C-alpha cells in the first residue's frame, strides 16, 4: 500500500524577533522557514541574509561575510563584522491597555 505525502501549499508563517542593543541599535530577524534561513535588518535599513549555523546551545545564524547572530532565552550577540560582538536583548512589545 503506497502512502501519499500530503504537501501543503500554504505559505509558512513568518516569524519576527526584535532585538535592541547599545547606542540605539535595533535588529529585526525575520524568517518564514523556522529560522533555517533569515533576513536580519539593522536600524540603518541594511539587510543581511543569514542561514542556520551550528551552535552549542541556542540558535545561531550566519553568512559567509562574517555577519552572525546567536541568541538564547532572550539574550544574544550580533556581529556585523567577524570578531566584533555586540550584546543584544530580545525586545518584546508590551501591550498596555488603558482603563
What name fits each language-model region?
Residues 2-99:
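Cysteine-centric segments in proteins
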Amino acid at each position: 500500500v503506497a502512502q501519499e505525502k500530503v504537501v501543503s501549499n500554504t505559505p509558512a508563517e513568518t516569524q519576527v524577533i526584535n532585538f535592541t542593543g547599545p547606542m540605539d541599535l535595533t535588529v529585526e530577524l525575520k524568517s518564514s522557514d523556522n529560522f533555517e534561513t533569515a533576513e536580519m535588518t539593522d536600524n540603518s535599513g541594511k539587510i543581511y541574509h543569514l542561514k542556520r549555523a551550528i551552535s552549542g546551545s541556542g540558535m545561531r545564524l550566519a553568512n559567509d561575510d562574517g555577519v552572525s547572530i546567536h541568541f538564547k532565552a532572550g539574550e544574544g550577540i550580533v556581529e556585523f563584522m567577524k570578531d566584533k560582538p555586540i550584546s543584544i536583548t530580545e525586545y518584546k512589545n508590551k501591550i498596555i491597555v488603558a482603563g
